[in-house]
Amino acid sequence: MKEKHSLKYVILVTFVATLGGLLFGYDTAVISGTTGALKSFFIDPLMTNAEAAVSVVAEYRITIGLCAALVGVLLSYFLYKMYSRTKATILSSALFIVGGIILYTQFFNQSDVLDVSMANSIRGFVISSALVGCIVGGAIGGAISTSIGRKNGLILAAILFSVSAAGSGYPDGMNVFGVEMVTSLIIYRIIGGVGVGLASMLAPMYIAEMAPAKYRGTLVSLNQFAIILGMNIVYFVNYYIAGLGDSSWLDTIGWRYMFLSELIPAFLFFVMLFFVPETPRYLVLKDRAEKAETVLNKLVGKTEASHELKEIKNSLTQKDAPWLSYGIGVIVIGILISFFQQAVGINVVLYYAPEIFRNMGASTDTSLLQTIIVGIVNLTFTCVAIFTV
């Protein structure tokens, strides 16, 4: 009876943490329903407003430059972690030189006129800008989890999701940056991306540190299920919102509701996090062993709590060893697997599915319905992977 009680508690805290994964998927896919509005509401009016167009192009270049510099700094940091100072300096210098050349030739050495090519480039960056935030969120996730904790890190992610949803829905009314409206939208999408990056790292970490060993693999895999489920939910939400009016309404008002709909799961995630504890591992790390044992009592029962606490303490014993000395090859293989997973082009489908179907002749409603089918297929084979691997 006690084990059943503990399992129910484990499932409860896992459910709360997987809301972070759900928001990951929700935030990633919500943009797919707004691609048409991004052109008609944000880009097309600039074609007849030369002054605003010049300002948008300038802000776009500055934003691209800042994002590229930030990513370059993060990559350089990891290069210095992995290699000697001399080798890391050479690689970092090469990285910035090549990156600078690409930026100059592709973005800065172009006309200030907002032509069709530049307009498409800006719209494409708006759609994918959250990925910049993902890089930042993923890079700082480790430091966040160590400094303020896994739970507080997830609370921060929930706040970022909420700010992004509200700001993306009203980039004009919440434009506190003093920039053009489309640039304000980009900034809020990047903020949401930081939340995605944090959640993608901290949610599975939280689950892994809370789950008993015999359930850990299954429960952690539920986070991936939640990500795909979040995508499917927002596909249905976008389809429902699109049905509330015609295409003109969708391009002027409806797209706002799509972004704002994320506030509901984000607020739910934020509130529920206050009803779950910090992980025992983090509590031990901060010399709060008694509190850690209290949490373990709820997770595994009193008979196992002392043993689990001892194992956690042993695992945190400091050992002097070079960074990644346990095998850089394993890390490289893991990174390459993730890289090639993205390189197949799945994000193009996730972001542009409705537009792809519209260009094939489907109406707005039909294209969103077809996107739901894509999401269901994605969810189905995610379940196959979870329960067969």
Show the residue positions of the predicted features.
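Short, well-structured alpha-helical segments
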Residues: 305-314
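Alpha-helical transmembrane bundle of multi-pass membrane proteins
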Residues: 1-290, 295, 314-389
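Conserved H-loop
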Residues: 302-306, 363
